[in-house]
Amino acid sequence: MLKEKYGFKEVEDKCNILWEGSKVYRWNGEKDNTFTIDTPPPTISGKLHIGHIFSYCHTDFIARFQRMLGKDVFYPIGFDDNGLPTERLVEQTYKTRAKEVGREKLIEMCHEVIEKSKQEFKELFKSVGISYDWDLEYHTISKETVTLSQMSFIDLYNKGYAYRKMQPILWDPVDKTAIAQAEIEDKVFESSLNTIVFSTEENEQINIATTRPELLPACVAVFCHPEDARYTHLIGKTTVVPITETKVPIIADDKVKIDKGTGLVMCCTFGDELDIYWQQKHNLPMKIIIDQDGRMSLHSVHGQKEEIWIPVSGHWDDTIGATGMTGERATQMTKEGGCDQKEEWIPVSATRMTDDILNEINGLKVTAARKRIIEILTEKGLLVESTNISHSVKCAERSGAPLEILPTYQWFIKTLEQKAQILDKVKECNWHPSNMRKRMEVWIEGLNWDWCISRQRYFGVPFPAWYSKRKGEEGKIILAEIKALPIDPSKDLPKGYSKEEIIPDQDVMDTWATSSITPQLSALAVNSEFSLPNHRYDTIFPADLRSQSHEIIRTWAFYTILKAHYHANSLPWKNIMISGWCLADDKKKMSKSKGNIITPHIILETYGADVVRYWAANSRLGVDTVYSENTFKIGKRLVTKLWNASKFVSMFMEKHQVMSINSAHETMDKWILSKLYKVIERATNNLLQFEYCEALGAIEEFFWKDFCDSYLELVKKRAYGSSEATLSAKQSLAYVLNVILRLFAPFLPYITEEIYHQLYSYNSVHNQSNWPSKEELIYDKYSEEMGDNVIQILNIIRKIKADNNVSVKHLIKKLMIKADLRKDKLDQSAQNDLQAVCNAETIEWMQSELETEDEKYIVNIDLY
């Protein structure tokens, strides 16, 4: 017999020890029978909240199902512990900034913090019953991962997919690093639309509206639409930029929107992507007036003969600021090998502001400079109007800072030239749900930039590259030898070069550059050419499943598909399963920065792991779910009911008895077995399509409606006897509960394991090949229909008793049933169970012709 009450804390502790000791989740390396899961490695950026647990449970439902189905499941756990998120955690933990402690000290601090965080993550994953094979654990800053990441980079470089170039990139002035297009988010800011007076060479005043007047010193042209009749007479002329008094051309271009603002637009080189497009199309000068700290950086040409230069190719080192250098310094860099020739440095026109205004603006943060420029324009009578507006601004996803566009040296991976091929790969993959594929396609079609993979940070995978200063090969890129990996170019030297002959690459890889090869990290190989010893590439690549949430389709999913295509002309996985978000009560994504997170430890302590998993399973694939305490309460009821139903069944069976349904011959027993046949079929098909929510729904409905509410009540009296009918009931009860436990096992692993151990076997319910098969059963259509008729009559009787305010056990003197006796009369076996459950002394059948299938029976009762 089971205990009176289920104690989840005691059971969870016992099961965790059991599972760890028995290695029930271990991957055995069966090449032809492996089911490989590409697991999302959590970012080491702080504590996990209930929203994280939500999505990790979804993957575990599939892992447990596939294991029980008979597959040798490869289910690793990784920790994404390199990169900017970890640096941010260190800065928050130690109340410092990376640049204050220096590179070496920061890296040391990062290692200390991630060790503590990883232990907390491990304990949480184990406490919620995630069935990882912990022997397959990996880390994105480990020696093996760094080696594979550097192999990946070298392979892409050798194939011409990775390149280094000076070009405008998205720059985060808070974290002081380049970021990729996929790492931006749009935020709404309060701002002002400022209409400013420009003057043409004929002293005609023209008005231009802008939200960024601080960029006036960078204005290199004014644009109008070629068909805008208001301004066609100005095309080809020049205008004077306010404050700077610089003359710039007025140019026609069809990308100008006639109905936006005044119809005139100033081009400021690096204001936005359209500015860059115009600069390149019309061969305009380049002016860089914002530095990497997000401050105004202006250079006066008064009394200065030489020009300011910026490099467009070659090596960029710390002696070169974001605003360029003088021609003398450019020549010096050429001699040192920083670039191949002086023609690779482009002159930048400096501002012609008066020195007093320049000195006042120089060094200000962008927002402060904007405010002061507006004041100066007002003082000079050059501001027509300033209107308050709300508008969308591109910001860094992590820091939240508004982005600038700066030309700097970065490493890139080609994406734009391979759009069509990547779209083909996307279509080859099976998307669950299928509509999520469209998100990926829209993202790829909208790409405007190649993937910038270099970051100006410290704690990450270094690029295995140096730049030669040797005479005759100045600026040459030197890559590490594969056998020398992993390397740190700031400490190691390339073969055949001295320290004086090279400049090490100081950047680190974007953390997505490593996360995008998680299938290969698990395989210990990038492809068949680049691998570690004892790799398992041929066994587990490509993976069977990638599970992730929808907001990283544009990053993790896209980059992983891109790299697998480049490395092996392959998909990284056959299926991708997309989870929605767990939303807070305010219907916003849970986020520590928003202050709306819920700590999983509190929920686990209150309800237990199975209830938390039940809550997670009640969300449909790809659909955002609002956190609901009510779902936890329903889950708790289910766990309690499963325990109590099992207690009842245990009264009619011997411990660990042999399962058999050979004697199950009574109609209602064959009815429940036929219903069980269908639910096994339905749940299996749902889980094969990764539809865990639908699978749980089918199992739960069967358990509550068919098994508990109907079958247990119908056979209760019969199970207490000693006849053949009793044996039929006992065998059916024991068998059906056994299957129910196995069906619930992927979702409720703890309580099912405990009951299974107590009643059926010392082996784990989660063992390989323990998923129930409908082939064990025989579907009996006659018994199912007969049983459904019993349930229909029983429900009518229950309603009549309720309407008469008597208990369901109240004795019925006579039960009178009208039906079409030629086809709807119950057989004797079914009638016996009905008579017992409704407590009727006699049943009288009467012929009746009824119209609809839903109203087969008219029931009347005589009560005592």
From Swiss-Prot:
Binding site for ATP: 592
Residue window of motif 'HIGH' region: 42-52
GO terms, biological process: valyl-tRNA aminoacylation
GO CC entries: cytosol
Main location: cytoplasm
Keywords: Aminoacyl-tRNA synthetase, ATP-binding, Cytoplasm, Ligase, Nucleotide-binding, Protein biosynthesis
Signal sequence extent: none
Entry keyword annotation includes ATP-binding: yes
Record field: transmembrane: none
Compartments it resides in: Cytoplasm
EC numbers on record: 6.1.1.9
Motif 'KMSKS' region: where in chain: 589-593
Disulfide bonds: none
GO molecular function, one term: ATP binding
Family: Belongs to the class-I aminoacyl-tRNA synthetase family. ValS type 2 subfamily.
Function: Catalyzes the attachment of valine to tRNA(Val). As ValRS can inadvertently accommodate and process structurally similar amino acids such as threonine, to avoid such errors, it has a 'posttransfer' editing activity that hydrolyzes mischarged Thr-tRNA(Val) in a tRNA-dependent manner.
HAMAP family, per the entry: Val_tRNA_synth_type2
Name of this protein: Valine--tRNA ligase
Gene: valS
